[in-house]
Amino acid sequence: MAEEACQVRRMKLGSQGLEVSAQGLGCMGLSDFYGAPTPETNAVALLRHAINAGVTFLDTSDIYGPETNELLLGKALKDGLRDKVELATKFGITASEDGKFGFRGDPEYVRIACEASLKRLGVTCIDLYYQHRIDTTLPIEITIGELKKLVEEGKIKYIGLSEASASTIRRAHAVHPITAVQIEWSLWSRDVEEDIIPTCRELGIGIVAYSPLGRGFLGLPRFQQENLENNKILYEKVQAMATKKSCTPAQLALAWVHHQGDDVCPIPGTSKIQNLNQNIGALSVKLTPEEMVELEAIAQPDFVKGERYDNNMVTYKDSETPPLSSWKAR
């Protein structure tokens, strides 16, 4: 099995000057969505272990918890650690008491959300601020216009989008350069390769791959009985190839993402230091062009059965916004 010993290299994310660790850490699971929250002492220890190991690109959101994940990072980054990390958080998803999600990108909300995140994180500036999901009730230009003001005011350094369509990315980028687009990309989720990845590369936008270990493969619709048997075959083939490579299936899947290009930064999440070390070990797994072809033949985009999410969460396929002309006409 590949070990942690390899050094975590640095990479340029996007074209605006942001430099991050080549592998980031998705922090959501420490507070939300995957069972009970990790005890604070353990979570802080994991975050600090990651930073000391060279994984300095930390990803959170105001909806994780909600809010408690940002508070956790704020505690972990005390004692001078803030300057050692690249801190990314997100806004734009709201949650009602009955668990239904809403989406807001109006200027007033953008500003309020940013100020609240700054306070919870205990920082004066957010390195990378994403719109977590697109508000389709108003033109994307309106949201990005307010984010641009926050950049000019020094409250955020760089702007990102999450789960945005190619056309939405283009429209946003025309208002202010987008540094990164966060999207689910893994052996189990490859639909973004058709349109979104080429668009990002054309515009010089960095790609942040969330759930690079196939979160959606092991849960939600893809784990339902009607899809399970088909998807199990895929996993077994990956497992067999991992055995040949003397690594774990997770390391092989993560290595595949790392081999997609120098503009791609995966952000796997974990609550255990042992798993974090194994994820770092994926950086030392080298795949030949022939092995990449073999892996991609195993994981054809149309082979995985089931949607990534249930009907309570939207993706880039639901992110088209009204034209700016319609907003001006109001």
Swiss-Prot record:
NADP(+) binds at residues 211-221. Its EC number is 1.1.1.-. Keywords: NADP, Oxidoreductase. It comes from the Eukaryota. Transmembrane segments: none annotated. GO terms for cellular component: nucleus. Substrate binds at residue 132. One of its GO terms (molecular function) is oxidoreductase activity. The keyword Oxidoreductase applies. The active site is at residue 64. It is an enzyme of class 1 (oxidoreductase). Belongs to the aldo/keto reductase family. This is Probable aldo-keto reductase 6.
